[in-house]
UniProtKB/Swiss-Prot annotation:
Keywords: Cytoplasm, Metal-binding, NAD, NADP, Oxidoreductase, Pyridoxine biosynthesis. InterPro entries: PdxA, PdxA_fam. The active site is located at the dimer interface. NCBIfam families: pdxA, PRK02746.1. SUPFAM superfamilies: Isocitrate/Isopropylmalate dehydrogenase-like (SSF53659). This is 4-hydroxythreonine-4-phosphate dehydrogenase. One of its GO terms (molecular function) is metal ion binding. Homodimer. The gene is pdxA.
Amino acid sequence: MSLLLPKLALTLGDPAGIGPEIVLKALADPQVQACAQITVVGERQVLEATYCLLRQRGATDLADPAGIPVLEGGSGFYLEPSRVGRGDVASGAASFAYLKTAIEEALRGQFQGIVTAPIAKYLWHQAGYPFPGQTEVLAQLSGSERYGMLFVARSPHSGWQIRVLLATTHIPLSQVPLTLTPELVRAKLDLLVGSLRKLFGIVNPVIAVAGLNPHAGEQGQLGQEEKTWLAELLRTYPHAKIWGPLPPDTMWLAPAQAWYGQGAPAVADAYLALYHDQGLIPVKLLAFDRAVNLTLGLPFIRTSPDHGTAFDLAGQGVARAESLKQAILLAAELALSSAAASRSLQAQR
């Protein structure tokens, strides 16, 4: 049976943060254990030290490190009790080494997907790795020029799944109008449509797109982008049914109703937000513990929990692993569906 399960790499993230704790908690979950063959990329000593510390503090919902397959990340990081919750240059460098190792092994075909625990971007920068985040490293090392961050969460209330793609990500708000172009939005729509078909089996998707300005520009009174190019681009886009540009404040009403199972609102298969907070504020309000970051456009599946390192919580036994569990389950599900889609395409040729 295990031979049929997808093989996933699970990085430890920053070893001084909550990454090791939520990895141990996630791997103790029977549903996670049954969904994939999981190899942790990091230091076994970090897992063992975290396990001992948390057991001393009364935690019981932990996987035993002795039974966890580990691929040593090559950083040589050693976790002492005094380093827990105190991220530094060494822990930042270690988290980068774990990710790099996982990517290299995935490109060699050893893993069908990567699940990444949280890292601290500022510690990467201090360690000499000036990347905006893990997504950009994944794209560069895999040679992926067109990629995107899709946030996915399934409602525990209704079973409905929200999918939100960001057109722009980690840039200052002042740069958003300068970065948004017809070419960029069209490329993001193409990426989203292709991914909905390949990964989620949605052949004819409906996509809702937010406007950039309040009230989607109010016919040019509150901003020109919608009037001068965005509305026309969406009207003529040929590969999916598009709703928009929609007023950003009211676009999220129907998804919220669907999330909580209120009535039968008209919802899209996916939503395109034009900048970071426009998409992630509603996602985190609805699904902070369940949202998963799915990177589109890579040659393998990559997911991550939608939260940070939480150094202030590390080692206390209180970190919640639900988002990481959801990231693992989604990676396993999509690895299987992606493989099935590839086999179907090959059979048609």
